[in-house]
Amino acid sequence: MMIFEKKPILYSLFVFTGSTIGITAKILQSIKSYGTSFKHPFMYSFILFSSETTGILTYKYCFQKEDEESLPKEESITKMKAQIHILTIPAVFDLFSSFFGMLSYENLPASITTMFDGGNTICVFLLSLFFLKNTHSKNNFIGVFLLIIGLFFISLSAIKDKNNSVDEESENKSGFVQTIVGIFCCIFCNIFTALHAITEEYIFKTRIIHPIKLIGFEGLFGTIFSFVFILFFSHIKFSRSIDFLCIKDKETGNVYIENFYIAIKQIIEEKQILFLLVLLFFLFIIYNYCYITITKVTNATTNIVLYNLTALFIWIFFLIPIHKQENQERIGILQCIGFLILILGVCVYNDVFTKNANLDESEIKNLITETSQITDDSLVI
């Protein structure tokens, strides 16, 4: 695990796995099997949380002994009892975040959806300001303002290119409606992602808990919750007026937001789906470890900012003219402008332009001391 302690490697793995997950999810949704696309938002959540559950075994056999020895025994037991139930809160937030995230992938181009994650930074900023009472600089406020402008241009780009996101199953619906629904799904995803990140940051600040332990038990609760939602929605029929959000049973003609039985039939009929789901499972393991470790060693906002970098790689991948028509993307002026403003906003938010120019008081004193020493040495010579 020493490799994850080096921040450049940690950040690189985070961005790489995040990009690959987005690309894989978009490809999965375009695969037709059993007469419909593989659109199962809670199924993706189930895969995500199942991968997180492996953290329980990792913690037990790799970290538990060292972790418990670092605290007095009685305090360790008290903390352990207090920690388990509280992890249901971030698990619920993560469940709804992944649900709305997958719905946005279904209704918007992959790069647009990923760029909208810039809204996570805005939500984390606001929540940390009001709930964690974190202090923010003037650059943070300017950065958030630029992020809002950037997202506005990206929204205009998505609406302008609405026809590019309309597939065969939604020909009876306006591409405009589908795009607006996708944008709102992105907004809800941002809110729940921010709540999830802030909750985890709060837990780290108020509890003594190993990050792998947090991943494992959060995944356990999330797996249970997502499976319950899968079974529940498998028996709930929806109106065909929202069929662009749903999967259709080719035998009965009914449409569902989620259906476990159709998913199994699709996996049996198309083996590529099974391969990509297994790939997602292992990608999630690496990604989640990086995610929680970055939150532990830095803060939730840094975590979100790094994830925004994946948009560039996803966009480049889907610009290559090798994809199905519904996945193929193109370079749009509004999207380029919005993305550049997003990058500028992220840089301003993180003081990239001023961080190296500003010296604190101790650094100034050290610089004066070193300069004086050099001057004295020159006089001696």
What are these regions (language model features)?
Residues 1-381:
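Polytopic endomembrane small-metabolite transporters, centered on the Drug/Metabolite Transporter
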